[in-house]
Amino acid sequence: VGIRRQCQMCIRDSITGTPIDDLKRVYETFAKTGAPDKAGTIMYAMGWTQHTTGVQNIRTMAMIQLLLGNMGVAGGGVNALRGESNVQGSTDHCLLWHIWPGYLKTPRASNVSLAAYNDKWTPQSKDPLSANWWQIYPKYSVSLLKSFFGENANAGNDFGYDWLPKVDDGKDYSWLSLFDEMYKGAFKGFFAWGQNPACSGANAGKNRQAFAKLDWMVNVNLFDNETGSFWKGPGVNPASIKTEVFFLPAAASVEKEGSITNSGRWSQWRYQGPKPKGNSLPDGQIIMELGNRIKAEYQKGGTFAEPIANLKWDYLTRGEYD
């Protein structure tokens, strides 16, 4: 066993470039956190999960912390480090397809009414000692609908629940599936907001082919990138591309003011430094202006205009974006 352990240490040494003595010191130091008066945390970045052995990495982290008693204690646990603070905001502020603000579930097609939606997603507990905080799920859902539609949301119209878009049951709307559907021609338009899927996607070549099947694309970013200019990529004939691309220059993080959330679930307010250059605008102002113009168009009517026409859009302060 000792020879095998030493051999494994040699392999780690050759792979990581870390001397064996230093590795031993790290292992021994962290193992000492498995004591009543100590705690240790494991902090990792996206590489651990996105690695080819990502599942094993995560399971191993959890097992190590459980064995050392480092779960459920102050200073313990397994904690992710974000490269960009508002990556955490993507979950806190419902930028992912499967959740809405407050971590409420995205309505499914089978949730035909607000009552059916609440019945589906409100957890039930027979344990008399269970706090079951989510038993008030219906209150959260009504509160969210009122924030969406304001005075237009009332008990008589199910608080506007029928105006919400619904996802098909059992269908995946995550990143890989989204671009696969785009590749199949299921999308007319695409907002590439603060991203560059022509380079960052798992199959960048397929993503670029998918862009060519769009009628239009809006690229919101600091600078033009490979996604916005996919039509002049290697081996592409621009004359054969039907996609109309619009570029909206956005302000950098230091050029705008606002709040962020991080992995520790605390919020931080960040003040503006330099003013945005040229005609670039903060993301929020771009969204605000788009919303104003789209609402103005839907006030004239159109197919299923009610959700947009009745949308509460009162984010201006003294007539200006704040």
Describe these PLM feature segments.
Residues G258-S259, G264-D322:
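Long, C-terminal catalytic modules of enzymes
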Residues V1-C7, I11:
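Single conserved hydrophobic/aromatic residue that forms the stacking wall/gate
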Residues R25-T41, L176-K188:
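Glycine-rich phosphate/diphosphate-binding loops that line cofactor/substrate pockets in enzymes
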